[in-house]
């Protein structure tokens, strides 16, 4: 029987390949995800372990707000370095400063940037090479007024040793002479689009506004000294708000942020692999059902010559297992290619990732194979069971068809119940009270799964009415071919329904994403329109990095400027939790209009040294009223009590302010290196070309500070959302492609099945052209049925979700929805190419005799 | 495997009635038919379209169940057998030859012939298998696939497949119905030969007088009843009998 199963597969190569492709893509996504994330993790591991080369212990600042914080740690006094060097167990120690917004300015006057990656600046100390994780490619290490930059950036931007380059960190852009080009470590590690700029310590301190301060001290111990002893000794001289860790643990602490990023990325991508596999399982089940229906006589013959039901079942399951194995193996290796593609995808969409070569772990192989084979076999169970119900007598009956399943007549109720249960679970997950985050996700996931199953099964009942409507244009313009196409689509509603269902899932998700994105965008736009009364906004070139407070200063002296108001942000420990504290310059009432629950616009101008305004939710959960005290601890450890002066209600789309907002003067006193997230500017006469030019000129010394009109600001702030949206679309396209194979497969099988009928049609005068058109129309009708159900379902899901989530409003991405329907039509046309060609090529005589 | 003595009864049917459908649309395809199939003989069932001859064969072979009446094959009543027991019965006692051959297209001629044994998990008797291929003239064609064989050759493969397990009885359903007349003659010769050389009990349903003429006994069915029962006769007699029934 095994041989028989293998022969059956081999004898139907095209069908097998088309069916298997559905699984190949799903498995490729899973294996590609693992390969991608493993490669990223390993690249980050390499980066962090080489950063702490030769380092036995590292001293850093410590945030008083959050112990686990690894970024924006307060710098400490440089004098510590001398004390550490004098410790008996210390062989060598160097101090350094770093800055994550050290922008290299290109010859076009713009910040050099590759896909959202950081712009790292730091001090280098070539006198202590044991600590140096960089190596020179050409040139020499920097002296005062010089810089070394990474050779990748230099190569891309044609920068040579001896050139002058402007660099903007915490002040105006300053010209530096490029003394050398460096690379990270000694290997060919790609650091993923980050730009590097290294300076001597004094220059770096000045550039980063950390004069007399250090961010880190790295220590090498004397021979024979234990790490524990070294750490204990260092601890004895540590001032408050500093900490020491071993080199290894410092490396893993630094890596923890990227670790959580890669594990998020992994889960995120696996979800799409799961979706593709889910869709693939529909395609497999459907293709196998059709194939098995066509093999009715074969199974019946086997029964008459003594095959038992169990043997038939086994034979079909062996077929699907072998197909699953082959598809999974192919998918596994295709995943390597896909991982490469994903690197490029993320790169082109603005998320460049580090890469040290593709990594295929054993776990990837196991998971990809197990998942691929399991999905195939599970999807084939139902068709296999139906094959066992073929009665032996079907061997002697012509045109024998599969008996309907035992539960066929309950299908409508069953699938309806399934979908209803799904909606109930989803609604419970969304609106039920007292659920944990995991609980919510479990119910939502379960609900979505049930809904998709239910709707997919129910879709066969929608085929006839939908095909009547969707096939009408084809019937009107396509003549007989159009009419026949519509009837063909309707004559096996179950088949058309499950073929369309595969596409339905992909389109439902795409629609859901588009609706949510549109909702987020319009709630954000609504918030900007409601809140901002300024004419201009200034942000970093990449729209999200903070900019030095000094950047906006030159705007103040531009004639006609009536207000320049910066908004800064930092963390503080308030009521035993970490909260964002924002601060605003005087003049806030001129650029922002808040809805006040307590207080009024005048609060902006009367914050003084300790005043604060808070948002409604924060006030409510901490029982605050005007006059309530807010005790806060800032990262440097300083304590400060603020007093509530006003309470405001932010719009659904959010506001520039955190839960607690204070005056910028107070903020600058409490926080080292204050930076602005936004600067809002008002001008006499509003937005005019003259004003724009004047502001651009004034801020020319700060290339990273971008002057935008408020409408540009809106668009730019939403740009990140568009990038995310594009990534989601590309990933969901995978499952749409899988369903496309499903359509191709169904049509090819249908053409086989209708060979004799096609021959008859040709014999009575149908042209090849008309045959092709007929198949094409049927394909488009099937695709459109999937699109209509999918888009409708996506809208329903989105409406439910939006009803639950406060910060998204209901908005209709009409353009996108129309586009999705058009994509479905295109998909239908694409899917029909091969089957239509096969159908048109049939030899009339042979087709008539085909049995 | 033939465990029935020659000239004994291998298949017996009593008062078979088969009604298709219910109520107003009910059709009585077979009406109180009784018969015994003698071992080692070739029995032909003749009759015009709709006479119930195919229904009779389906019932005798256990492919369909009678509305009333009893059947036993090799002495075993089959009315109460479940699917597994019926499968076992088919393996041991029944071979089939079909009008449209029903070969598996992906298997070679040899593999098709051996399939019943493969399914039953048995090893072929090499000598018997060689003799069978020789007899059916397939020795040179054993590695060919059905698509590479002519219709006659395909039916030879099917006959060899039916014989390979030495079943108690072979049921042939219009074995020449899809073949030209010259090839039909060869196939009929082969079937006759299998009865003469191997003592293979065979029941053949046909509407071809020439086919019926090779049988040891010819039953005529009309309107669901046996109307004539002839011993071995030539084609002319058969045709005359057919006309007499007056279809």
Predicted regions: what they are:
Chain A
Residues 27-58, 266, 289, 338-347, ...:
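Alpha-helical transmembrane segments
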Residues 16, 20-118, 155, 216, ...:
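Hydrophobic, regular-secondary-structure patches
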Residues 51, 136, 141, 184-223, ...:
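Small-residue transmembrane helix packing/gating motifs
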Residues 115-156, 553-558, 562-563, 567-629, ...:
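Short beta-strand boundary microenvironments
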Residues 8-15, 273, 280-324, 383, ...:
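Interfacial "coupling" helices/loops that link adjacent transmembrane helices in transporter permeases
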Residues 288, 322-352, 364-389, 418-433, ...:
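Small-residue-rich transmembrane alpha-helices
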Residues 44-47, 240-275, 293, 439-449, ...:
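Peri-transmembrane interface segments
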Residues 11-18, 264-267, 363, 367-380, ...:
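Alpha-helical transmembrane segments, especially those used as permease/efflux helices
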């Amino acid at each position: 029987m095994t041989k028989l199963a293998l022969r059956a597969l081999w004898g139907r190569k095209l069908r097998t390949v088309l069916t298997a492709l559905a699984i190949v893509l799903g498995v490729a996504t899973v294996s590609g995800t693992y390969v991608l994330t493993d490669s990223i993790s390993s690249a980050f591991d390499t980066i962090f372990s080489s950063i702490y080369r030769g380092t036995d212990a590292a001293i850093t600042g410590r945030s008083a707000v959050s112990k686990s914080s690894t970024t924006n740690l307060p710098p400490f006094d440089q004098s510590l370095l001398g004390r550490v060097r004098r410790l008996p167990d210390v062989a060598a120690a160097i101090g350094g400063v770093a800055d994550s917004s050290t922008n290299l300015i290109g010859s076009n006057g713009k910040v050099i940037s590759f896909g959202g990656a950081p712009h790292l600046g730091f001090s280098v100390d070539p006198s202590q090479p044991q600590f140096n994780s960089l190596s020179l490619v050409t040139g020499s290490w920097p002296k005062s007024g010089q810089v070394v930059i990474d050779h990748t950036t230099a190569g891309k931007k044609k920068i040579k040793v001896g050139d002058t380059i402007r660099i903007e960190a915490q002040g105006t852009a300053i010209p530096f002479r490029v003394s050398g080009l460096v690379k990270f470590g000694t290997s060919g590690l790609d650091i993923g689009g980050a730009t590097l700029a290294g300076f001597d310590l004094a220059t770096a301190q000045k550039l980063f506004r950390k004069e007399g301060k250090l961010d880190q001290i790295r220590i090498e111990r004397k021979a024979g000294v234990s790490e524990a002893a070294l750490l204990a000794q260092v601890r004895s001289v540590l001032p408050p708000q500093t900490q020491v860790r071993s080199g290894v643990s410092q490396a893993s602490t630094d890596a923890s942020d990227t670790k959580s990023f890669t594990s998020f990325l992994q889960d995120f991508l696996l979800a799409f692999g799961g979706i593709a596999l889910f869709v693939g399982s529909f395609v497999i089940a459907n293709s196998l059902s059709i194939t098995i229906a066509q093999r009715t006589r074969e199974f019946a013959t086997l029964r008459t010559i003594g095959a038992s039901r169990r043997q038939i079942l086994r034979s079909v399951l062996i077929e699907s297992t072998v197909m699953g194995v082959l598809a999974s193996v192919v998918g596994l290796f295709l995943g390597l290619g896909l991982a490469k593609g994903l690197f490029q995808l993320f790169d082109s969409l603005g998320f460049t990732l580090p890469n040290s070569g593709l990594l295929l772990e054993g776990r990837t192989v196991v998971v990809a194979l197990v998942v691929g084979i399991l999905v195939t076999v599970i999807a084939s169970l139902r068709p296999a069971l139906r094959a066992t119900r073929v009665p032996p007598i079907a061997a002697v009956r012509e045109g024998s068809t599969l008996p309907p399943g035992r539960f066929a007549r309950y299908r409508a109720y069953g699938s309806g119940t399934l979908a209803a249960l799904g909606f109930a679970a989803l609604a419970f997950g969304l609106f039920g009270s007292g659920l944990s985050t995991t609980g919510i996700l479990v119910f939502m996931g379960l609900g979505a799964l049930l809904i998709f199953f239910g709707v997919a099964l129910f879709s066969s009942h929608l085929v006839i009415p939908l095909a009547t409507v969707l096939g009408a244009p084809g019937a009107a313009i396509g003549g007989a071919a159009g009419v026949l196409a519509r009837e063909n689509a309707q004559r096996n509603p179950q088949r058309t329904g499950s073929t369309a269902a595969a596409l339905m899932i992909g389109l439902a998700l795409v629609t859901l994403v588009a609706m949510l994105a549109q909702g987020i965008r319009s709630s954000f736009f609504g918030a900007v329109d409601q809140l901002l009364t300024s004419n201009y906004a200034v942000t970093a070139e990449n729209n999200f990095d903070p900019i030095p407070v000094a950047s906006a200063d030159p705007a103040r002296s531009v004639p006609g400027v009536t207000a320049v108001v910066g908004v800064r942000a930092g963390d503080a420990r308030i009521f035993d939790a970490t909260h964002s504290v924002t601060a605003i310059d005087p003049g806030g009432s001129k650029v922002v209009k808040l809805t006040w629950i307590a207080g009024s616009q005048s609060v902006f101008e009367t914050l003084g040294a300790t005043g604060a305004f808070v948002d409604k939710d924060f006030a409510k959960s901490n029982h605050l009223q005007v006059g309530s005290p807010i005790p806060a601890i800032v990262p440097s450890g300083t304590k400060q009590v603020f007093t509530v002066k006003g309470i405001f209600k932010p719009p659904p789309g959010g506001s520039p302010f955190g839960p607690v907002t204070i005056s910028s003067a107070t903020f600058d006193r409490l926080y080292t290196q204050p930076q602005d997230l936004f600067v809002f500017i008002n001008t006499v006469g509003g937005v005019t070309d003259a004003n724009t030019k004047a502001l651009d000129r004034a801020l020319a010394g700060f290339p990273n500070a971008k002057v935008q009109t408020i409408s540009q600001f809106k668009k730019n702030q939403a740009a990140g959302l568009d990038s995310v949206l594009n990534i989601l679309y590309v990933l969901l396209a995978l499952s749409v492609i899988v369903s496309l194979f499903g359509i191709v497969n169904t049509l090819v099988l249908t053409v086989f099945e209708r060979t004799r009928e096609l021959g008859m049609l040709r014999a009575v005068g149908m042209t090849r052209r008309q045959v092709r058109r007929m198949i094409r129309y049927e394909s488009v009708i099937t695709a459109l049925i999937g699109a209509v159900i999918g888009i409708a379902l996506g809208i329903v899901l989105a409406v439910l979700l939006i009803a639950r989530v406060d910060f998204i409003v209901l908005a209709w991405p009409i353009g996108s929805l129309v586009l999705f329907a058009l994509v479905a039509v295109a998909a239908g046309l694409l899917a029909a190419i091969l089957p239509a060609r096969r159908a048109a090529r049939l030899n009339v005589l042979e087709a008539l005799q085909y049995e | 495997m033939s465990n029935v003595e020659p000239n004994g009864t291998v298949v017996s049917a009593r008062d078979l009635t088969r009604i298709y459908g219910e109520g107003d649309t009910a059709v009585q395809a077979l009406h109180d038919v009784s018969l015994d199939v003698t071992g080692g003989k070739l029995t032909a069932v003749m009759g015009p379209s709709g006479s119930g001859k195919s229904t009779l064969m389906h019932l005798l072979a256990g492919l369909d169940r009678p509305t009333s009446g009893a059947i036993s094959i090799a002495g075993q009543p089959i009315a109460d057998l479940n699917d597994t027991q019926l499968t076992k019965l088919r393996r041991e006692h029944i071979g089939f030859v079909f009008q449209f051959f029903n070969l598996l297209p992906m298997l070679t001629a040899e593999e098709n012939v051996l399939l019943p044994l493969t399914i039953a998990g048995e090893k072929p008797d090499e000598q018997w298998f060689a003799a069978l291929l020789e007899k059916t003239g397939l020795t040179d064609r054993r590695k060919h696939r059905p698509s590479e064989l002519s219709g006659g050759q395909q039916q030879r493969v099917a006959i060899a497949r039916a014989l390979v397990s030495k079943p108690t009885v072979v049921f042939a359903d219009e074995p020449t119905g899809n073949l030209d007349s010259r090839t039909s003659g060869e196939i009929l010769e082969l079937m006759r030969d299998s009865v003469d050389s191997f003592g293979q009990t065979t029941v053949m349903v046909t509407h071809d007088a020439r086919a019926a003429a090779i049988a040891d006994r010819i039953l005529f069915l009309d309107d669901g009843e046996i109307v004539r029962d002839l011993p071995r006769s030539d084609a002319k007699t058969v045709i005359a009998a057919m006309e007499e029934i007056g279809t």
